[in-house]
């Protein structure tokens, strides 16, 4: 993997580290030799913070093997005043910074500092060690020099490692993790690194040797101690992307359509390392898009981020990255008291496949072509539909469309259906009409747009219900919707008692998902096209042109004839 030369073209879907399939990279040192590594590190500098496990399960002899590995690693790096610097933290119940970056810049001095470290012992709090790395371990780090943290552990941390690891990555620190023995929690290693490529595992501390030091050094150096490929960030409350370039970055990274929002943009002044760039934004800002999924059950979060390489202008080298994270909903375990009975009870469980739901805008009719361009005032149909996966003959689910809004892509939103599924403004959208299956709803509307904003996108929530044993009664169709000014036709008016049941029955729904239309570009008027001439007029024009052409030919022939005759009649 190599740093990208102004090319970050990709579309990524990432899963939160909590649901990553835990697997570790075996050590592959077959093509790595000392000469290759020496050539790689000679002209490259890096700030390395090494975190050694000093918990009670380690012991003094095993801890010394970690110190030997630290010396192997230091000998591979270009340790010098202008080259690489190293800091070291040993951690147990309480982490301790043994020496800081830049404190020992000569290989002999650094080796002496490592040898004098004494084993600490205690509980395993890797999270605290990562926090100490952020608070004190980075002191003395030079601007423009990439930063790497390497964590060695033989088990499971007793505190949280996810949040401090994310904070380190936000500070442009690339984290590597080495798990020793089969008892190590590989899942936590993935949480620390954020990328399985930077996870190494060995079976014993005897394998913390020169070969591993070579493999680790090469893995870091071959991408110049920066991310080799763009990496996305799926935080608990934010989303983003990180990448590296071959040349110093002088442009801006921003959320599409939000260049002028400071929270949604990062420039060179925000990148300590001008070749390691990226942007993270909170879920609540920059029009970050979120929608729920029932299968698998969880939430998708997505945003489009633009890498603009010129400081002022968009150019052909700029790239847009669509970043998507999926946050899976954890299973809920409910404990209930059990009563002992001599009577055997038989339970039968029925599993239903969830329907596939879609929201589209149709031209001219509810089943017309999907609209992506429309004219202001044009009649277009909203269409919500859930299709039974098990076959059209099934009649398992019903649906309620509710909580709809229209968005112009700049964070400006206007509600058009309320939480009960009723229309709010007849000019924008009235209460949808449902067919008898309760899995299809449609409603016509006349195209509108925001002032100076030609693009619209609609989003709604669909709550599903099981029709079995009256499970959709009181949920759908929407109940007791008020007639809106300027609205005609059928309206859903029901007994007030059913209205009171709606909130209670919505909670009984199978699940709620988010659906949204394609973006629609609204034109003020249709482009003027030149009308073809009527057929009789075309025919007349052809006759006229023919007569003129024949006349010209006749005149030309007469002229030639008279000229020729005049010459013959001249006296010799």
From Swiss-Prot:
Its primary localisation, in coarse terms, equals membrane
* Residue intervals passing through the bilayer: 542-562
Spell out the InterPro entries in the cross-references: CUT_N, Cuticlin, VWF_A, vWFA_dom_sf, ZP_dom
Signal sequence annotation? 1-24
GO MF annotation terms? structural constituent of cuticle
All ranges on the Extracellular side of the membrane: 25-541
Q: Which UniProt keywords apply?
A: Cell membrane, Cuticle, Glycoprotein, Membrane, Signal, Transmembrane, Transmembrane helix
Q: List the GO terms this entry assigns under cellular component, sorted alphabetically.
A: alae of collagen and cuticulin-based cuticle extracellular matrix; plasma membrane
All copies of the VWFA domain together span 47-216
Give the record's membrane topology: Single-pass type I membrane protein
The entry's localization annotation reads: Cell membrane
Gene knockout outcome: RNAi-mediated knockdown results in shorter and fatter dauer phase animals (dumpy phenotype). RNAi-mediated knockdown results in a folded pharynx in some animals. RNAi-mediated knockdown results in no alae formation. However, other studies indicate that RNAi-mediated knockdown results in partially formed alae.
Q: Which residues lie on this side of the membrane: Cytoplasmic?
A: 563-572
Q: Which SMART domains match?
A: VWA, ZP
Question: Where on this protein are sugars attached?
Answer: 78
Q: Domain ZP spans what residues?
A: 233-479
Task of the protein: Plays a role in alae formation in dauer larvae probably by regulating cuticle assembly.
Name of the featured protein:
Cuticlin-6
